[in-house]
Each structure stands twice: as structure tokens, then as C-alpha cells.
């Protein structure tokens, strides 16, 4: 019978439990750790007497309460209320007597009594319920009461039934259904309990232990005193931990209230696991070492369990003092909400909210109300926030000795932190109206502080987000200043800043154009970097103010958002006031900063102005206007007046775009020069008929203008074919060609490239007298890429354009036996398309149509040499003078600044070459030349070609 009851009936009950995932599912009912001592052959054992008839007769005679003892038993009976007039219908078993497989219906069975121990008496397979009405019209409760050392095994407590345990009694394998109750008092021990809609109570005066308990289907476990160990609370079920709840598991939909009955310093809960969807509320006392995947709330706002749910007091008044969670772990997806009281030693992988705003549980959800709860503030101490975790403070929430170890911290308005450390990429945001005391240490991570004006909460401290002390310990420590557009000014205040990292006057996600910040410091020390922003064309930007003292040496990087900065507006901008600063206190990163088209330098004020620092287009110190020394803090900034007539230095980006505007004419010229060499070759080989040819070209240009100097390397290939037409006293050669050429730019300001794809037509007219005319018509498609240096990094731009041109050369071939001389005059013209593009730094570039008009006169002389094998060699030399007539290839930067790109001037040109006719079909040629002029030097220009005659 015992095996049938447990292995069939109990699993059926378990199947009615709330379904959960495999990882968070209520366990099957526990096996009892003890078994009954009742003999298996009790009903046939001659040592035991069936005493049921006597019990029944005694009740029928009007005796309501009596005992049976000394190896008596009652078995297989439905024991019901016989006389409704009885205040209680009770039978007590003593001295190795047994109740087996009985139903107690509105009657009471005691195992042991208050005077005599049960002495081995037990109740086995008992059902307890109440269905009968007593003489007062009330349902009479069925009761199984264990006294002394009495024991019960496999008990089912149904509606209006009760299992009451006193003394040192023990109960194993108990099921309590809805309307049933199990009371564990004294020093009793209850193990393997299934509270299936019923109630289990550990009484106020007890030191009892309930172990291996499952509470489901709206059941309740009330621990007034004593200990409940290894309890599993299911959906819509409740546990009150007033004594000690040890190793409790709360499943989806479960609720636990920790309310110490022994005062706020008493641990009422230890090692609870709160699964997703479950809730734990600590109202009084201490919860230790909770593992939270669901929600843990620490609050002095009370409430009540009603109809399978917890309902908080509607007015959110704090009625209870002293609630605390110690050493909890808030896992990913979990939440710890501190409304009042304290959480100490929390490990946060999920979310910790330290927020004293009114609110409570309504319908299973947390509903916030307006206003502060008042009284005890919410406080988190010794918290560690790991990667993926968040600590958020608001509404007078406080956190001290916090380590943000890869996680995030948000200190919203009315929030307060003290002695915080950021490491392993952790971040902290202090919003307008939040503040930090103690030291905020950034070992490796980022601190963001939001600016503002005076806040009602922190106005007595300073403007905006406020910190008493911040310590940026290294290069990976960053302070961001977030602009506040909702206040009249955006000021952030730190009393003492130790700065060995980076202070960035913008938010981590970037900065909106035209929004700037002011940082107010009392003292500054260290060797860090400030990254600041300006709009010099508008005369506005970030500002750093150090009111008392500064020690150390700092780097400054500046970004400018102005798009129309003009040279006449390139005046010094007041960037820093630092009381007591020296000439080496601040220095610009890389010596200068590119702001629009110009370079700016960070300069120290003169003796009368030595605490002020300016962005200036001149490296010398600007002279301020006469007047009193500037006062620290807010107020009109000094307006230095730079020396007139000094031209500001161009920025690296400006130099790069000016250089790129010169690329296409020189690239076109490199291709044209090699094509003219080809025409000279076919003039010298006068027996030429028709054929195809190809050549490789390589040139280097060194270009220097008023604004830029750079090197341009050109490499490419050309392919073509032509045919000779004989005329009267002359010949005409006509051909076409295609080319690909690449130019690489290299300078102190940029490395860029240009790819050229060209096609062309050419012709030569040769008169028998030696006169000739060469003509070339060529068109190109250019693809350019510019990568200028920009404030320690690079900016980029790509552009496409087209161009074309023509060349005419007139000369005479004069033969002097084996020698020849060719004087010539040549003119070439090129024009490129106007171009307009933008660097990704925001600089706008508009380049006029690139133009070139060149005239050249020169002399080629050489000798015909015939080798023994018939090979014809024609070594030659060339000298020439060339002049570029075009002066104004203008470039406009940021729609306002116009720069002339003047490559005009005269140059001398010298070259050596050789043409070889190898046989009737094949010939080859090569040439190398040097050219030097005012703006362009060509250290070498070389080509190698080969031709096949049909």
C-alpha cells in the first residue's frame, strides 16, 4: 500500500504543477529520508490488536477523547464525526500503536500526547479532511496531530484538514491540498512536503525544520520561525521568510517576502535562487547570497498576499525600517531594485536599480508613482558591476565603494555615488543633477558627465554634473563631457581632477555640430590630453577653466566644425584659462591642428595674460587688448589682436586638395610626351609602312608652388597602331592609341593617387624635303583618391573627372650623311573638367577647370649606325626650352577660401634616347630625360617601347 500511494498518487499530483522550462522546472516530489517502522504484516501479526471497534464504541458511548496504547492499531477506516456535540472527537495512539490507511474526516488523531511520548507510534497513509458540521453549524476540521516523538508517513491533507506537529515529532512525505494546513511547531521535522494549494506554517515559537518542500498551485509556506530548507516555490505560490529560509528556489510566477521576525539585523533568508519571472521582496531583515535571474526588491513598503499575487500598499508609505540584501548575484536578465534600505556586496551581471521613487507591485508588474518614498534612502554598497551589467541611481539613491568592472553605471538626477572605480572598459554616466563624492577612479574605462546650469538638487555644489574628485589613471581612461541642450548653459564641474588619460569635450556617441561644453575645475594635475571642439568662424567653442592651481603638462587636440573659416577671420580664440599655468603647461598635439583651411597653434598669453591660452593662426603669442587681467570663470574672454599682415599656415588637408588639383595636367603631359616620342621614332624610320606598338612609361615630378610641395610618380602603359599613306612628295602617317597611367602623390600632407584612362588619335606629315608636322588629339578619364593627414589621423575623398587636349609640333629633319638634326617648335593645350567634392572631415573642395598651355622649342640631333648584322641604331640627344603660360588654376575650400595654383614658368629639358630597327618586322626604342623649371622638376622621365610592322 505504501508503494502504491507514493509512486502513483504523488506523480499524478506533480503533473498538475505549473509547466516550466527544463532548466527552471519544479522538481518531482522528494523521497522521504525515513520509512515507517510499522510491520509489513501488521494486519495479520498476532502481536498487534485491531482496536477500531473499541474506539468506535467508546465514541458512541459519548466519550469524546481517549487513548489506545501498547501495540494497538486502526486500519482501513473512514473515521468520521459521530457526535456533532463533541467539541473534538479525538483518539490518541501511544506506545507502538499505529494508524494505517485511514481517513480522518472532521475528527482528530493524535500520535503521542503532551504528557507521554508516542513511543514508536506512527500514522501511515493518512488522509485528513473536514466535511462534517458540528453542533454550532461550523465545519469541523479533521486533524492529525503529532506530539512528542510521534511520526507520520505519506499524509494527504485536504480541504479543512490539518497536520499539526509539536515537540520532536516528524512527518515524511506530506501532501497539503487547497484548504489544508500543515503546522510545524516545537522542534519538529517535516521532510518531503508537497504544498499543493494548501499552507505550511512554521510556527512563531518553534525551532522546527521543514526540508525538501515543493509549494505549487497557489500554495503558501509561512516561516514565522524555525528553518525551511530546500523549498521550491512555484507559480502563484508564496513563501514568507520570517524565521530562516535556506536554499529556497523561486520559479516563474513565485513570490517570496523576507520579513524578519527577530529584527532588522537578523538573517531571514539565505542562498535563495530567484528564477526568471519570480520575485523576492525584502521588507525587513537580511537576505544573504541570493542568485537572482528574476527580480529582487528591497523596500520598506509593505503589502499582502491575496488571490495568488502580492499587492503593495497603494500609498507606498514606508512602514518598516531595516531591510538589506547581502552578497546577492544579479545574473543577466535579473533585476535588483532598491527602493529603501541597503544592498551590500552585490555582483551585478543584470540590472541594479537604486531608486527611492514611490511604486509597488500591481497585477504582477512594478508600477511607479510620482514622488519619493521618504524616510530611509536606497543605498548600494560594495557593488561590483560586471560586463553586461547596469547600476542605475535616481530619486535619492546612493551607491558607495562601487567597482564598475566592464559594466555600466548611470547616475541620474538626484542620484549620488561615492568612491567609484571603473576598470576593464567599465563606464559611468553622471547626468545633470547627479553627483559624486569621494574619488571617482577611472583605471580603464570611460566617465561621462552631462553639463547644465544650476540644478535644484546640486546647486550648492556647482553647475551641471558634479564630482568632488576624479582620477583618470592612464591612456585608456576617458572623461566625456555631454552637452545639455535643455539648459541655458552646459557646464560640468569637478573640484579636483587628476588627469593622465583623455578628456573629450563631447559625448561618447559623438557631438552635434554647434554644441559646446565648459569644464570647471578647481585644481588640475597630470599629463593627459584634452580633446576640444570649436567653431572659429562663429567665434564659439569649448572652454576649460581651472580656477585655483594647475600642475603638470597636458596635450590639447582641437576639432573645428566651421565650414566657412576665412583667412581674415582666422583670429585667436580663447580656449583655456588655467590659474598659475606656465609656458609648457599646455601644448598642441603634433604641434598644431588643422581647422578648415588653416593650421592653428596653441599659444600662451604674454606676461600680463599668462594664465590664458589661445588658438592662433600664428605660432607666436598674441597680444591681448590693453586692460585688466582676465578673471577666471564665466565672463567675457580676452580678445587678442594678432599682428596684421601675417599670412596663416595652410592645413594639411588644404595642401592636399591643392596638390590634387595639379595632378591631371602633369599626368596628361606625361602621356603626351611619350606619344610625341613615338612620332619622332616613326619619322626617323622613314621606310615604315604600318604596324602596332606598345610602351611602358615611368616619370617622377617634384612640384613646388606657393602653397604646396609634393612628389608625383607616374607609371603606365600605352598601346597603339598606325598606317603610312604615301602622297606626292610626302607621306602621311595616321594612328590611334589607348593608355592606362597611374600617378601616386606623396608629401608631408597626403598620399593620394590618380588613375588615368586615355584614348587618342595622332598623325605625322612628312615632306621629302625634311619638313614635318605632328598632331595629337587625346581624351582622358581620371579617378582620384586623396588621403590627407588630419589632426593625427587621415581624412579621405574620391572624385572622378574628365579632360582632354591637343598638341602640334612643326620641325625639319636635316640629314648630314650619317648624322641628323631636327629643330622644332611645339605647342600643347589641356583642359580638365571642373570638380567639386568633399573630404569625410567635412572640408568642401571646388577646383576650377585644370588648364595648361605650353610652348616648347628644341633641337634633336643624332647619328645613324648600321651594325654588321644589318641592325640600324639611331642614338640621339635632345635639348629644349619649355614655357607654361597658365597661371590661375584656382581651388576654393569651404566655399570661401580661394587659392591660386600657379605652375607657370620656363624650364629646361634634356634627354637621351635610342631607336633600333632589329629587322624588317621588329624595332624598339627607349628614352630618358630630365627637366628643371621654377615649379616643376622631373628628375627622370623614361620609356621603353617595341613595334611590330605588318
Q: Predicted segment positions?
A:
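Gram-negative bacterial Sec-dependent N-terminal signal peptides
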Residues: 1-24
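Outer-membrane translocation/initiation segment of Type V secreted surface proteins
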Residues: 2, 24-30, 34, 47, ...
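N-terminal segments that cap or nucleate solenoid repeat domains
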Residues: 22-132, 136-139, 145-148, 311-312, ...
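Extracellular beta-solenoid/beta-roll
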Residues: 324, 347, 364, 379, ...
Amino acid at each position: 500500500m505504501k508503494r502504491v500511494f507514493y509512486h502513483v498518487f504523488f506523480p499524478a499530483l506533480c503533473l498538475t504543477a505549473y509547466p516550466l522550462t527544463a532548466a527552471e522546472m519544479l522538481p518531482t516530489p522528494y523521497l522521504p529520508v525515513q520509512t515507517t517502522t510499522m510491520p509489513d504484516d501488521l494486519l495479520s501479526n498476532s502481536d498487534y490488536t485491531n482496536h477500531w471497534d473499541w474506539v468506535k464504541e467508546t465514541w458512541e458511548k459519548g466519550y469524546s477523547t481517549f487513548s489506545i496504547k501498547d501495540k494497538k492499531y486502526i486500519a482501513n477506516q473512514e473515521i468520521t464525526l459521530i457526535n456533532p456535540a463533541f467539541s473534538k472527537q479525538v483518539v490518541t495512539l501511544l506506545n507502538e500503536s499505529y494508524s494505517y490507511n485511514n481517513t480522518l474526516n472532521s475528527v482528530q488523531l493524535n500520535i503521542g500526547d503532551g504528557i507521554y511520548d508516542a513511543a514508536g507510534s506512527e500514522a501511515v497513509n493518512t488522509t485528513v479532511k473536514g466535511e462534517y458540521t458540528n453542533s454550532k453549524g461550523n465545519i469541523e476540521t479533521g486533524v492529525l496531530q503529532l506530539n512528542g516523538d510521534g511520526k507520520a508517513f505519506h499524509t494527504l491533507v485536504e480541504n479543512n484538514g490539518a497536520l499539526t506537529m509539536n515537540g520532536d515529532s516528524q512527518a515524511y512525505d506530506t501532501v497539503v491540498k487547497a484548504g489544508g494546513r500543515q503546522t510545524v511547531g516545537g522542534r519538529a521535522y517535516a521532510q518531503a512536503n508537497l504544498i499543493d494549494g494548501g499552507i505550511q506554517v512554521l510556527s512563531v515559537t518553534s525551532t522546527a525544520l521543514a526540508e525538501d518542500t515543493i509549494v505549487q498551485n497557489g500554495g503558501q509556506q509561512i516561516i514565522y520561525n524555525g528553518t525551511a530548507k530546500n523549498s521550491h516555490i512555484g507559480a502563484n505560490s508564496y513563501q514568507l521568510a520570517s524565521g530562516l529560509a535556506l536554499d529556497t528556489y523561486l520559479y516563474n510566477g513565485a513570490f517570496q517576502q523576507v520579513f524578519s521576525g527577530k529584527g532588522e539585523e537578523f538573517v531571514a533568508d539565505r542562498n535563495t535562487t530567484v528564477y526568471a519571472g519570480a520575485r523576492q521582496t525584502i521588507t525587513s531583515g537580511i537576505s544573504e547570497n541570493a542568485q537572482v535571474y528574476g527580480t529582487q526588491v528591497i523596500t520598506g513598503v509593505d503589502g499582502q498576499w491575496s488571490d495568488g499575487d502580492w499587492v503593495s500598499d497603494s500609498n507606498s508609505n514606508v512602514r518598516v525600517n531595516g531591510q538589506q540584501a547581502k552578497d546577492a548575484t544579479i545574473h543577466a536578465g535579473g533585476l535588483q531594485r532598491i527602493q529603501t534600505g541597503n544592498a551590500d556586496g552585490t555582483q551585478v551581471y543584470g540590472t541594479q536599480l537604486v531608486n527611492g521613487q514611490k511604486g509597488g507591485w500591481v497585477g504582477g508588474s512594478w508600477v511607479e508613482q510620482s514622488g519619493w518614498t521618504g524616510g530611509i534612502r536606497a543605498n548600494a554598497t560594495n557593488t561590483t558591476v560586471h560586463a553586461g551589467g547596469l547600476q542605475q541611481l535616481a530619486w535619492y539613491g546612493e551607491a558607495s565603494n562601487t567597482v564598475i568592472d566592464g559594466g555600466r553605471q548611470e547616475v541620474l538626477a538626484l542620484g549620488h555615488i561615492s568612491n567609484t572605480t571603473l576598470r576593464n572598459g567599465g563606464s559611468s554616466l553622471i547626468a545633470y543633477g547627479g553627483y559624486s563624492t569621494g574619488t571617482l577612479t577611472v583605471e580603464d574605462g570611460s566617465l561621462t558627465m552631462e553639463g547644465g546650469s544650476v540644478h535644484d538638487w546640486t546647486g550648492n555644489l556647482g553647475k551641471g554634473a558634479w564630482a568632488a574628485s576624479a582620477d583618470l589613471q592612464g591612456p585608456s581612461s576617458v572623461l566625456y563631457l555631454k552637452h545639455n541642450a535643455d539648459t541655458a548653459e552646459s557646464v560640468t564641474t569637478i573640484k579636483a581632477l587628476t588627469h593622465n588619460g583623455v578628456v573629450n569635450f563631447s559625448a561618447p556617441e559623438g557631438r552635434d555640430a554647434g554644441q559646446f561644453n565648459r569644464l570647471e575645475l578647481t585644481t588640475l594635475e597630470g599629463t593627459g590630453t584634452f580633446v576640444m571642439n570649436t567653431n572659429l568662424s562663429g567665434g564659439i567653442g569649448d572652454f576649460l577653466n581651472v580656477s585655483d592651481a594647475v600642475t603638470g603638462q597636458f596635450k590639447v587636440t582641437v576639432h573645428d566644425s566651421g565650414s566657412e573659416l576665412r583667412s581674415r577671420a582666422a583670429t585667436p580664440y580663447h580656449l583655456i584659462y588655467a590659474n598659475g599655468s606656465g609656458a609648457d603647461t599646455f601644448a598642441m598635439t603634433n604641434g598644431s591642428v588643422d581647422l578648415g583651411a588653416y593650421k592653428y597653434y596653441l599659444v600662451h598669453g604674454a606676461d600680463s595674460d599668462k594664465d590664458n591660452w589661445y588658438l592662433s593662426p600664428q605660432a607666436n603669442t598674441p597680444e591681448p587688448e590693453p586692460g585688466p587681467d582676465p578673471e577666471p570663470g564665466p565672463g567675457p574672454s580676452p580678445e587678442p589682436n594678432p599682428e596684421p599682415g601675417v599670412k596663416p599656415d595652410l592645413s594639411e588637408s588644404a595642401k592636399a586638395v591643392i596638390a590634387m588639383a595639379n595632378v591631371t595636367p602633369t599626368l596628361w603631359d606625361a602621356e603626351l610626351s611619350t606619344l610625341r616620342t613615338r612620332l619622332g621614332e616613326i619619322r626617323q624610320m622613314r621606310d615604315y609602312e604600318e604596324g602596332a606598338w606598345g610602351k611602358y612609361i615611368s616619370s617622377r615630378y617634384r612640384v613646388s608652388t606657393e602653397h604646396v610641395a609634393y612628389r608625383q610618380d607616374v607609371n603606365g602603359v600605352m598601346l597603339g597602331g598606325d598606317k603610312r599613306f604615301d602622297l606626292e612628295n610626302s607621306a602621311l602617317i595616321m594612328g590611334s592609341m589607348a593608355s592606362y597611367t597611374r600617378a601616386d602623390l606623396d608629401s608631408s600632407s597626403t598620399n593620394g593617387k590618380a588613375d588615368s584612362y586615355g584614348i587618342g588619335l595622332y598623325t605625322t606629315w612628312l615632306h621629302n624635303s625634311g619638313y614635318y608636322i605632328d598632331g595629337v588629339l587625346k581624351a582622358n578619364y581620371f579617378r582620384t583618391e586623396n588621403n590627407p593627414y588630419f589632426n593625427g589621423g587621415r581624412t579621405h575623398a574620391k572624385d572622378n573627372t574628365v579632360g582632354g587636349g591637343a598638341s602640334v609640333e612643326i620641325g625639319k629633319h636635316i640629314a648630314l650623311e650619317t648624322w641628323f638634326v631636327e629643330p622644332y617648335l611645339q605647342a600643347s593645350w589641356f583642359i580638365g573638367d571642373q570638380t567639386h567634392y568633399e573630404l569625410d572631415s567635412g572640408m568642401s573642395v571646388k577646383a576650377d577647370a585644370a588648364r595648361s598651355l605650353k610652348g616648347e622649342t628644341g633641337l634633336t640631333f643624332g647619328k645613324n649606325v648600321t651594325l654588321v648584322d644589318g641592325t640600324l641604331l639611331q642614338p640621339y640627344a635632345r635639348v629644349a626650352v619649355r614655357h607654361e603660360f597658365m597661371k590661375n588654376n584656382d581651388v576654393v575650400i569651404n566655399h570661401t577660401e580661394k587659392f591660386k595654383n600657379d605652375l607657370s614658368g620656363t624650364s629646361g629639358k634634356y634627354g637621351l634616347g635610342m631607336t633600333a630597327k632589329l629587322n624588317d618586322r621588329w624595332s624598339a626604342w627607349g628614352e630618358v630625360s630630365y627637366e628643371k623649371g621654377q615649379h616643376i622638376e622631373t628628375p627622370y622621365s623614361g620609356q621603353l617601347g617595341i613595334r611590330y610592322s605588318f
